[in-house]
Amino acid sequence: TEACRRADNGAAFIDRVRAEANIDLEVIAADEEAELALIGCSSLYDAPQGDKAYALLFDIGGGSTQITWLKLHHVAGAPDRADTEIIDCSSVPCCVVTLSERFGCGEDEEGRASPELYGQICAHVRDLLAAFDARHNISRLVAEGAVQMVGTSGTVTTLTGVFLKLPRYNRDRVDGRQLKFTELGSARDHLLGLDRRD
């Protein structure tokens, strides 16, 4: 979606899809994309408990990452569910494709991603998210345990599958799975240890 929003030839692409495939594409705005992701994940939010009253929804796509900052509210008569209110959303030009284009492979002698490359990527992503983070004090709230983080789409489900050591995607085991930061770190470390043959 973001690729079509940013592309110089986005309108020509939509016209070509219509002409060749008889499909009318609609490129939606970033805030509508965030709202649709929110609806798709609505059953995943735990009811707010104490100070844990916020959620960060992130969707790492092919052309961008959508981030949505949410306030969680109790649902009358449903103590284990949360109602969500969008506080803010942003579409960041950061994803697997854009990072690969910007940083390349950065492999060491063994064909693994170098620690230097990984550090550069992390710094770049932090820079892209800094204004959104500062505007809402998200890092502080995450450190205080006040935030649920919900990820959606292929990158997140793939990372979950890596952590679970699945030979192939298994929706029943992946969808709705909760991971701790240490578990995400374990999956990251596993991926960083792979070479191009793996």
Short names for language-model regions:
Residues 63-64:
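Active-site-adjacent helix-turn-beta-strand microarchitecture at beta-sheet edges
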